[in-house]
UniProtKB/Swiss-Prot annotation:
GO terms for molecular function: rRNA binding; structural constituent of ribosome. GO terms for cellular component: cytosolic large ribosomal subunit. One of its GO terms (biological process) is translation. The lineage of its organism: Bacteria, Bacillati, Actinomycetota, Actinomycetes, Micrococcales. It comes from Clavibacter michiganensis subsp. michiganensis (strain NCPPB 382). This is Large ribosomal subunit protein uL22. Part of the 50S ribosomal subunit. Keywords: Ribonucleoprotein, Ribosomal protein, RNA-binding, rRNA-binding. The gene is rplV. The keyword Lyase does not apply. This protein binds specifically to 23S rRNA; its binding is stimulated by other ribosomal proteins, e.g. L4, L17, and L20. It is important during the early stages of 50S assembly. It makes multiple contacts with different domains of the 23S rRNA in the assembled 50S subunit and ribosome. Belongs to the universal ribosomal protein uL22 family.
């Protein structure tokens, strides 16, 4: 089983909005996920698209380094999660000398691509045959 990891940190999109996009692609084939992200209207879909493409390139390089064959259509998103990054705190002036805080949140996004094991293929085939 080939596994490749790609991370992007300090992306200026709120974790809540990024999680909506990541939930759409979790468990899907990598090429299918790229197609979904390409046409998704959410703003977080662009950095996640680039991240999945980077993870696919990482898998390609890893397979070349170990002289093993990698079928890119077999890659699927094994794990994908969004963690909260640092928060940029800004202040907006208000009436009578007051200031309201504005939190500009950032995200750390991680995507793990993998090829299915023989055991994974057997269990999915068994479930499909019922």
């Amino acid at each position: 089983m080939v596994e490749s990891i790609a991370r992007v940190r300090h992306i200026r999109v709120t974790p809540q909005k990024a999680r909506r996009v990541v939930d759409m692609i979790r468990g899907k084939q990598a090429e299918e996920a790229l197609a979904i992200l390409k046409f998704a209207p959410q703003g977080a879909s662009e950095p996640i698209y680039k991240l999945v493409a980077s993870a696919m390139a990482n898998a390609r390089v890893k397979a070349d380094a170990s002289n093993s064959f990698l079928a890119e259509q077999d890659l699927y998103i094994a794990k994908a999660f969004v963690d909260e990054g640092t928060t940029l705190k800004r202040f907006q002036p208000r009436a009578q000398g007051r200031a309201f805080r504005i939190n500009k949140r950032t995200s750390h996004i991680t995507v793990v691509l993998a090829t299915p094991d023989e055991a994974d293929v057997a269990t999915t085939t068994k479930k499909a045959s019922k």
